[in-house]
């Protein structure tokens, strides 16, 4: 923008921001009359306008470069055609309007992507998701869709033989539970949030412990055809011995079998296979690129 002589000023000490720091953000103040030229200059540098409800005097711009998220918060200066009102009643009304706008859908098309991170225990799902939460400088929601075991049951569980009817009922219960959890995630995605799923019900396609054929068939239908498929799927991958060394759950042979099942089931369906044995930063960077691609497609940039 300097080359185009666009007038702007840094805010909140942003001229000293380290752009290479995770989750960094640059705040500027800009005259509304300069906005058109500024947006054209930012587009040339790979930035995209991120429509965010409830912020009428702010324009957000997002870019992704070599595994890093870059964000510019451009606040429109008062005046120059921007109508403002003062006083406590107007301020309260503005806050209420902002809160309502942040909960409404951005449009007729869902703007926020739903990205699922899958993999056996010890693959690094929690580590990757926490890093993405810290580094992605836009609205982000995390939904846990795994089974919560009671404390003290980290070892292998003995599966009792149950009737086919009871097993089918359990599959139905799990489907209803996951649908209710996914509803919260998709509501956030409709408001523009990036939604990260820590596990996902579609894992049942790879790891099916059903003992009866009727329950296995029902699970394939409910979880494979009627469960909403994420916009992007990342399969975190590591050898069984490495997975066992990280969490000491199951056995190396069981974990290796699960690893192969994840690879064979989801990679042919378009999932991104991300190795977590080449360093955590490399895995985070690759997962970030997957999320960016999903956001880019949902926003139609």
Please give the residue ranges for each predicted region.
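Hydrophobic anchor at the beta1->P-loop junction of P-loop NTPases
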Residues: 117
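ATP-dependent small-molecule kinase phosphotransfer cores
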Residues: 145-217
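Hydrophobic positions on the alpha1 helix immediately C-terminal to the Walker A/P-loop
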Residues: 128
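Conserved lysine of the Walker
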Residues: 125
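P-loop (Walker A) phosphate-binding loop of NTP-binding proteins
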Residues: 120
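NTP-dependent small-molecule kinase module
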Residues: 241, 248-301
């Amino acid at each position: 923008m300097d080359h185009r002589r666009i007038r702007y000023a840094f805010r909140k000490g942003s001229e000293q921001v380290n752009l290479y720091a995770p989750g960094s953000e640059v705040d500027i103040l800009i005259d509304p009359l300069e906005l058109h030229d500024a947006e054209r200059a930012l587009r040339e540098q790979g930035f995209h306008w991120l429509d965010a409800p409830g912020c009428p005097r702010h324009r957000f711009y997002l870019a992704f470069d070599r595994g890093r998220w870059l964000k510019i918060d451009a606040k429109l200066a008062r005046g120059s055609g921007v109508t403002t009102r003062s006083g406590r009643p107007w301020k309260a009304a503005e806050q209420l309007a902002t809160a309502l706008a942040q909960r409404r859908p951005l449009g007729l098309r869902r703007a926020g992507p739903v990205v699922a991170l899958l993999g056996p225990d010890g693959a690094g799902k929690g580590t990757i998701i926490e890093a993405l939460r810290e580094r992605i400088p836009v609205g982000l929601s995390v939904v846990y869709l795994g089974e919560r075991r009671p404390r003290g049951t980290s070892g292998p569980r003995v599966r009792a033989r149950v009737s086919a009817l009871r097993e089918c009922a359990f599959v139905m219960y799990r489907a209803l539970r996951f649908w209710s959890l996914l509803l919260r995630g998709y509501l956030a995605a409709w408001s523009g949030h990036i939604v990260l799923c820590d596990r996902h019900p579609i894992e049942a396609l790879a790891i099916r412990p059903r003992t009866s054929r009727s329950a296995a068939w029902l699970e394939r239908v409910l979880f494979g055809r009627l469960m909403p498929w994420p916009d992007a799927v990342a399969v975190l991958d590591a050898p069984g011995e490495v997975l066992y060394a990280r969490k000491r759950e199951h056995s190396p042979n069981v974990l290796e079998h699960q690893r192969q099942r994840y690879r064979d089931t989801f990679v042919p369906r378009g999932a991104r296979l991300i190795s977590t044995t080449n360093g955590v930063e490399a895995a985070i960077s690759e997962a970030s690129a997957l999320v960016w691609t999903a956001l880019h497609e949902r926003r139609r940039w």
